[in-house]
Amino acid sequence: MSGEVPPNINIKEPRWDQSTFIGRASHFFTVTDPKNILLTNEQLENARKVVHDYRQGIVPAGLTENELWRAKYAYDSAFHPDTGEKMTLIGRMSAQVPMNMTITGCMMTFYRTTPAVLFWQWINQSFNAVVNYTNRSGDAPLTVNELGTAYVSATTGAVATALGLNALTKHVSPLIGRFVPFAAVAAANCINIPLMRQRELKVGIPVTDENGTRLGESTNAAKQAITQVVISRILMAAPGMAIPPFIMNTLEKKAFLKRFPWMSAPIQVTLVGFCLVFATPLCCALFPQKSSMSVTSLEDDLQASIQKSHPELRRVYFNKGL
């Protein structure tokens, strides 16, 4: 539809049906589009104004439905869904593909020596710390100590895993050695994400009814949200870290790379990038962004409170984070 926009579109929700995987994938292909990181501050502020005005019933003359949705997705790409704060540039989901293809490609090219492992795992976990904090659920702030603990623990876990597996794989096929970075990344995700979101595990994340009315905070919802994010992140990294090793193992035996060994890194980065263009939105779409759980799965005191104020309510909803 390209005519003037009707006044009753619910732009608090994505454009596509989020109850289906295809709908969620369409949504995240738009949210993770790397072109969004090229938007200027002026364009983002204009998008925010369009979205906020429309929510208040103010429709600028000449605004079309497609323009409204473009503004909504520009807004969603840069502003946190719970706090409304502008997110750090490299922490936005639209930066995932360019940042991860560079870091992952280098991790998988320079994995044979201890200094290289230390450096690239440190770079990767520094980036992950920014992403995990930027895309946390809810509005609970982390202290400097909590941030530091999460960052140091994840970096230590990733480096220890990588170095330990490097030592174990010295006497096996070089192909197996190429999978060490993936094992390190998977281990680090299991450490970094829960620690970076530890306050949610302590105090809970906001849960609402289907209309967005806040009902309280739930640690059980936080556990479900964080588990889903860990699974998504590991699977997101898998294609880019599992497919290129087979290709590179074959290419490095060819005359071309023997003659031009410096081409190994750019080829690896390109292969990883191609995988991530598809893996990032598809794995974000595995679970609904607006996740839900049964009221009976909540903590006893929150259950009692909800049953008292909303006796007919059966499910609650929450932002799982990304």
From Swiss-Prot:
It is found in: Mitochondrion inner membrane. The chain crosses the membrane at residues 103-120, 147-167, 175-195, 229-249, 267-287. It holds the Pfam family SFXNs. One of its GO terms (molecular function) is L-serine transmembrane transporter activity. Residues 2-102, 168-174, 250-266 are mitochondrial matrix. Keywords: Acetylation, Amino-acid transport, Membrane, Mitochondrion, Mitochondrion inner membrane, One-carbon metabolism, Transmembrane, Transmembrane helix, Transport. It is a multi-pass membrane protein. The keyword Membrane applies. GO terms for cellular component: mitochondrial inner membrane; mitochondrion. Its main location: mitochondrion. One of its GO terms (biological process) is one-carbon metabolic process. Residues 121-146, 196-228, 288-322 are mitochondrial intermembrane. The keyword Nucleus does not apply. InterPro entries: Mtc. It comes from the Eukaryota. PANTHER family: SIDEROFLEXIN, SIDEROFLEXIN-1. Amino acid transporter importing serine, an essential substrate of the mitochondrial branch of the one-carbon pathway, into mitochondria. Mitochondrial serine is then converted to glycine and formate, which exits to the cytosol where it is used to generate the charged folates that serve as one-carbon donors. May also transport other amino acids including alanine and cysteine. Belongs to the sideroflexin family. This is Sideroflexin-1. It comes from Rattus norvegicus (Rat).
